[in-house]
Design a protein with these regions (language model features):
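Intrinsically disordered terminal extensions that flank WD40 beta-propeller domains
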Residues: 1-35, 346-348
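Canonical WD40 repeat/beta-propeller blade segments in eukaryotic WD-repeat proteins
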Residues: 32-42, 77-84, 123-141, 177-193, ...
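Non-catalytic interaction/regulatory modules that flank or connect domains
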Residues: 268-377, 580, 591-592, 698, ...
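Intrinsically disordered, low-complexity regions in large eukaryotic scaffold subunits
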Residues: 334-337, 357, 371-397, 819, ...
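Extended amphipathic alpha-helical scaffold segments
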Residues: 313-317, 321, 331-338, 342, ...
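Structural hallmark of WD40 beta-propellers
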Residues: 47-51, 69, 88-92, 101, ...
Length: 922
C-alpha cells in the first residue's frame, strides 16, 4: 500500500511540475493608467521621450504607444525634478532628500530598460537649519550635457563639471542692497542662453536676475526686478526674456551689452488684474509670430481655487481650466537654433490627476486624445469586466496622431483584441483597448441621461460665454464629484457576439443596452420588480430609486438602452448575468434575485425570488443610509414574527449537499483546516453573490436544457430549470422557471461562484459560440458537473443528482477567505494546440492559487497583492487567458500574467548615441 501511495504522490507532483513548466509563470507585466501623485516632468525633443516622476520615487518613461519603461529609486523619496541629458537616453533626478540620481536606458536581451547607474548625496538634509541653505531649489543641465548648475535655498549657485567637481558662482558687482546673501532669497530659475551656451540667466526669489558668463566668470548684465520672482524663460533670439511673478504678472526684459544694469523692463502686465492675483508659477515664451503660455495668475478672490494655464497669441486668449493642480508643462516645438521661430505644435500639461495635450496647430487649440496615461479614475472605478478575443465586428463598432513618438515598439501586433470595461461612480462605463501595453480609451457610455438627477449638467457652465473674463475653457476629463452616488455602476455583463450589454447600479437599476450604428430617439421601457413580494414587517430605510425620464430620449450611435428593470427595494445590484441567445438577464440584490425576458418586455415576463432571511434587518438599511444597526430587541422581535410565518409554509426539500462528504476529524489534512459552520443569523445572509445560465442536465440524466443558478451569502444555491421558447416563438411565449434543486452548504459560507462543466470537465461555451462555429460543442454525452466555490472551499457535484464528487478546503491559514475566482484556459508554451483549463483563485491574503479542473488539485501558488491592500484585492479581475488586473492606486491598474504564453509587457527599444567619455557624466 505504501508503494502505491508513493506512486500516486509522484504522479501528482509530476502533474504540478508539468503544469508549472508548460503553462504557468507569475509576472507583473505593466502598469496601466495614470501614475499616482506625479511630481515632475521632462521631455527630450531629440529622442521624443517624456518622463514623469512621482512622490513615491518612481520614474516612468513614455514614447510612442507601447514604448514604456519604469524605474524606482531605492528610497521612497519624492522626485522633485527630472532632466534628460539631451539625446543621450540618460536622466538626472532630484529627490526631496537632496540626492541626485543618474539613470540610463540600457539594452538587455534586445530590449530597453531604465537602470539607475549613479547617485550623489548633496550636503543638507531637510529640516536642519544649518544645511537648509544648500538645499537644491532648481537644476539646469546644459544642452551640451557638460555642466550641471544647481540653485540653492541659500541663494548660492553650484556648478558641477566632470566627476561632480564643484564650483561656486561668486556674486561680484551686485548692487549694495542685494549684497547680503540671504536677502537675495532662494534661486528660483536657471536658464541657458538660447544662442550662447556659455551664459546662464540666474533668477533670485526677491526679483534680482543676473546674466552670468561661465567662461569669464563674471556678471554680464543685472536686471533689478523688485517683484517676487517665480519663473524665467528666454525668447529664442536671446535678445530678451520674460519673468513671471507672485503678483500674477509677467515682465519682458531687453538684454543689451551696452546697458549692464537694467532697472526697468520693456513691459509689465498683470493679465487678470487689477485685483490681487495668484502667482504665475511658470511661463513659456514660444514664437510663431508671438505666443506666451503660463500657469497660474488667476484673480485671487474670484478664481483663486482654479487650476489654470493661459495661452496667448495675438488676439487669441484662452484660459484652460483644469480640475486638478498643474504640476508642469512643456511644448513640442522646433529646437533648431538657426530657425527664426519655435512654431510649437503641441502643449503637454501634466496635472495632478491626468495628462492633457493641446494641438497648437489646429484652429481652436483642441485636445489630443492620449493613447496611454488614461485617467482611469476620472470618476472613481466601481467595477470592471474583461472581454478576451473580441470579434472584429464589435471592435470596429467601438474604435489623431500622438505627438510623443520616441523609441520603437518591438511587440508583435496582438493576436486577439481585448476589451477592458470599467464602471464608474458617475454612472458611466468606459471601454478600453487592453490588447497591448498602452491602455487606450475607445468609448464612453453614460447611463445618467435616462434618469432625472438633481444636478443636470448645464452646457453653459462648461463653455465660457463670449463676454466672460477670464475666457475659461474646461479641459480634461478628471471629474471626481459624482452628481448622484446612486448612479454608480456595480456590475457589468456583456455578450461580445450580439452587441448586448447589461449594466446594473447602486439604486437597483438594471439597464439592458443594444449596440446600434444609428442615432435614436426613443422611450425606454421600465419594468419594476418587487423582490420582497408579499413579505410583511420589512421597511426599506435606504435611498430612493432614481426616477426615470418620462418621454423619449435622444441617444447617440453606440450602446443604447432599450429597457430599465428597477428592483424594489432599490438596493445595490450585487450580481448580474446575460444570456443573449435566450434573451434573458438575471440579477440579484441583498433581497433576492430575478429573471427577465427582455425580448418580451412589453408583457414584462418576470420570475423572482426573495432570499431574505427572517432576521435580515440590516439588508433593509441600504449602503447610503446613515443607520448603522438596529437595536437588538427590534431584531429579535423581527425574528419572532418571521419564524411564525415561515414555519407554516411548505418548503422544497433542501439537500444537505455536505452530508455525503461529512468528514471525520482523522481525514482533515493539515492544508485543509476544519471549517466552522456559520449561523443563519449572520447579517445580510440573503445577498445574491453570483448568478449563471447553463444548458445542462437538471431534471434527469437524459434531457438537457436551459438552467439558471443563484448563490447567496448564506451558502444557499438555487437551481432552476427554464422553459425557453424557440427562436420562432419568442414573441408569443414567455420563459418559465421551475425550481429544480436547492442546495444548502453546511458551513453556510458565502457562494462566490458557480460554473457548470461538461462531460469532459470543460467549462460550457459562451452563448452563440457553438451556433456560430467559434467553439467546439460541449460534451453532452458524459455526465455534467457543477463547480460551486464558497469563501472557504471548492466543491464539484455530479448532475443531475447533485451528488458530491470532489472538494478542496482553502483554509490552511486562519482567516483565509476566497475573494475572486475564474476559470482560465492556459495554453502550453511548447504547442499552441495544447491547452488546459484551470481554476484561478485570489484570497483575502492577496495570494493566487491555481487548481486543476475538475479534480481540484492544487497546481501552483503565487504571492500577488499585499494582504493590507484591501482595495487592490477587491478590484482584482481575472481574464479567460490567465491574465489579471488590479488597482494599485485609484488611477492605475497593475497587470499580471499567470500564463507562461500570454504575457502583455513592454517590449521596446530606444536607440541612442552616447559620447564615449562617460566619466564626464558620472
Amino acid at each position: 500500500g505504501g508503494v502505491m501511495l508513493m506512486k500516486r504522490h509522484d504522479t501528482v507532483s509530476e502533474c504540478v511540475i508539468c503544469f508549472f513548466f508548460l503553462f504557468s509563470s507569475f509576472t507583473q507585466t505593466v502598469e496601466h493608467g495614470f501614475p499616482n501623485q506625479p511630481s515632475a516632468l521632462a521631455y527630450d525633443p531629440k529622442l521624443q521621450l517624456m518622463a514623469i516622476g512621482t512622490k513615491s520615487g518612481a520614474i516612468k518613461i513614455y514614447g510612442a504607444p507601447g514604448v514604456e519603461m519604469t524605474g524606482l529609486h531605492k528610497d521612497t523619496a519624492a522626485v522633485t525634478q527630472i532632466h534628460f541629458l539631451y539625446g543621450q537616453g540618460r536622466i538626472l533626478s532630484l529627490l526631496d532628500d537632496n540626492t541626485i540620481h543618474l539613470w540610463e536606458i540600457v539594452q538587455r536581451e534586445n530590449r530597453s530598460h531604465l537602470v539607475e547607474v549613479h547617485s550623489f548625496n548633496l550636503p543638507g538634509k531637510p529640516g536642519i537649519e544649518s544645511t537648509s541653505a544648500t538645499r537644491v531649489t532648481v537644476m539646469l543641465l546644459k544642452l551640451s550635457c557638460e555642466l550641471l548648475a544647481l540653485g540653492t535655498e541659500g541663494g548660492g549657485v553650484l556648478l558641477f563639471v566632470k566627476s561632480f567637481t564643484c564650483l561656486v558662482i561668486p556674486l561680484f558687482s551686485v548692487p549694495e542692497e542685494y549684497k547680503c546673501g540671504k536677502s537675495l532669497g532662494p534661486v528660483e530659475s536657471l536658464q541657458e542662453h538660447p544662442q550662447d551656451s556659455d551664459k546662464i540667466l540666474i533668477g533670485y526669489s526677491r526679483g534680482l536676475v543676473v546674466l552670468w558668463d561661465l567662461n569669464c566668470r563674471h556678471v554680464d548684465n543685472l536686471f533689478l526686478g523688485k517683484q517676487q520672482l517665480e519663473s524665467l524663460v528666454w525668447e529664442r533670439s536671446g535678445n530678451s526674456f520674460v519673468s513671471s511673478h507672485s503678483d500674477g504678472g509677467y515682465m519682458v526684459w531687453a538684454v543689451s551689452s551696452s546697458n549692464p544694469c537694467t532697472h526697468d523692463p520693456i513691459s509689465s502686465t498683470i493679465p487678470y488684474g487689477p485685483f490681487p492675483c495668484k502667482a504665475v508659477n511658470k511661463i513659456l515664451w514660444r514664437t510663431t509670430e508671438s505666443g506666451l503660455l503660463f500657469s497660474g495668475g488667476m484673480p485671487r478672490a474670484s478664481y483663486g481655487d482654479r487650476h489654470c494655464l493661459t495661452i496667448l497669441q495675438d488676439s487669441s486668449h484662452v484660459t484652460l481650466d483644469f480640475t486638478s493642480r498643474v504640476i508642469d508643462f512643456f511644448t513640442i516645438h522646433c529646437t533648431d537654433r538657426e530657425k527664426e521661430f519655435d512654431d510649437p505644435s503641441a502643449l503637454v500639461v501634466l496635472l495632478e490627476e491626468e495628462l492633457v495635450v493641446i494641438d497648437l496647430q489646429m484652429a481652436g487649440w483642441p485636445t489630443v486624445p492620449a493613447p496611454y496615461l488614461a485617467p482611469l479614475h476620472s470618476s472613481a472605478v466601481t467595477c470592471s469586466c474583461h472581454i478576451s478575443n473580441v470579434p472584429p465586428k464589435l471592435w470596429e463598432r467601438v474604435v489623431s496622431n500622438w505627438p510623443i513618438c520616441g523609441g520603437k515598439n518591438l511587440a508583435a501586433d496582438p493576436k486577439q483584441k481585448e476589451l477592458l470595461l470599467t464602471g464608474h461612480e458617475d454612472g458611466t462605463v468606459r471601454f478600453w483597448d487592453a490588447s497591448g501595453v498602452s491602455l487606450k480609451p475607445l468609448y464612453k457610455l453614460s447611463t445618467a441621461n435616462i434618469f432625472q438627477t438633481d444636478c443636470e449638467h448645464n452646457d453653459s457652465l462648461t463653455q465660457a460665454g463670449e463676454e466672460e473674463w477670464p475666457p475659461f475653457r474646461k479641459v480634461g476629463c478628471f471629474d471626481p464629484y459624482s452628481d448622484d452616488p446612486r448612479l454608480a455602476i456595480q456590475k457589468i455583463s456583456v455578450c461580445k457576439y450580439s452587441g448586448k450589454l447589461v449594466v446594473a447600479g447602486t439604486a437597483g437599476q438594471v439597464i439592458v443596452l443594444v449596440l446600434s450604428d444609428e442615432k435614436s430617439d426613443h422611450m425606454i421601457d421600465v419594468a419594476t420588480v418587487d423582490l420582497l413580494q408579499d413579505r410583511e414587517g420589512f421597511t426599506w430605510k435606504g435611498h430612493d430609486r432614481l426616477p426615470p425620464k418620462s418621454g423619449s430620449v435622444v441617444f447617440a450611435p453606440g450602446f443604447q438602452p432599450v429597457v430599465l428593470v428597477q428592483c424594489m427595494p432599490p438596493a445595490a445590484v450585487t450580481a448580474v448575468t446575460l444570456h443573449a441567445e435566450w434573451n434573458l438577464i438575471a440579477f440579484g440584490t441583498s433581497h433576492g434575485f430575478g429573471l427577465f425576458d427582455y425580448h418580451r418586455r412589453k408583457s414584462f415576463a418576470f420570475f423572482h425570488r426573495c432570499t431574505l432571511h427572517p432576521n435580515d434587518s440590516l439588508a433593509m438599511e441600504g449602503p447610503l443610509s446613515r443607520v448603522k444597526s438596529l437595536k437588538k430587541s427590534l431584531r429579535q422581535s423581527f425574528r419572532r414574527i418571521r419564524k411564525s410565518r415561515v414555519s407554516g409554509k411548505k418548503r422544497v426539500v433542501v439537500q444537505e449537499a455536505n452530508a455525503q462528504l461529512a468528514e471525520h476529524d482523522a481525514e482533515v489534512t493539515p492544508v485543509q483546516r476544519r471549517i466552522e459552520p456559520r449561523s443563519a443569523d449572520d447579517s445580510l445572509s440573503g445577498v445574491v453573490r453570483c448568478l449563471c445560465f447553463a444548458d445542462t442536465f437538471l431534471r434527469d440524466g437524459t434531457h438537457h436544457g436551459p438552467t439558471m443558478w443563484a448563490g447567496t451569502n448564506s451558502g444557499s444555491v438555487y437551481a432552476y430549470a427554464l422553459d425557453v421558447p424557440s427562436q420562432e416563438k419568442f414573441s408569443e411565449q414567455s420563459v418559465e422557471a421551475l425550481l429544480g434543486k436547492e442546495i444548502q452548504l453546511m458551513h453556510r459560507a458565502p457562494v462566490v461562484s458557480i460554473a457548470v462543466l461538461d462531460g469532459r470537465g470543460n467549462p460550457l461555451p459562451e452563448p452563440y459560440e457553438v451556433s456560430r462555429d467559434l467553439a467546439k460543442a460541449p460534451d453532452m454525452q458524459g455526465s455534467h458537473s457543477v463547480l460551486i466555490v464558497s469563501e472557504e472551499q471548492f466543491k464539484v457535484f455530479m448532475l443531475p443528482k447533485v451528488s458530491a464528487k470532489t472538494k478542496f478546503k482553502l483554509t490552511a491559514h486562519e482567516g483565509c477567505r476566497v475573494r475572486k475566482v475564474a476559470l482560465s484556459n492556459f495554453t502550453s508554451v511548447s504547442s499552441e494546440e495544447y491547452s488546459e483549463n484551470a481554476l484561478v483563485c485570489l484570497t483575502n491574503l492577496g495570494d493566487i492559487h491555481v487548481f486543476s479542473v475538475p479534480a481540484l488539485r492544487p497546481q501552483v501558488h503565487y504571492d500577488c497583492i499585499r494582504k493590507e491592500d484591501i482595495s487592490g484585492i477587491a478590484s482584482c479581475l481575472f481574464t479567460k487567458t490567465g491574465q489579471g488586473f488590479y488597482l494599485i492606486s485609484p488611477s492605475e491598474y497593475e497587470r499580471f500574467s499567470l500564463s507562461a504564453r500570454v504575457i502583455t509587457e513592454p517590449l521596446c527599444r530606444v536607440d541612442v548615441e552616447r559620447p564615449h567619455d562617460l566619466s564626464a557624466h558620472r
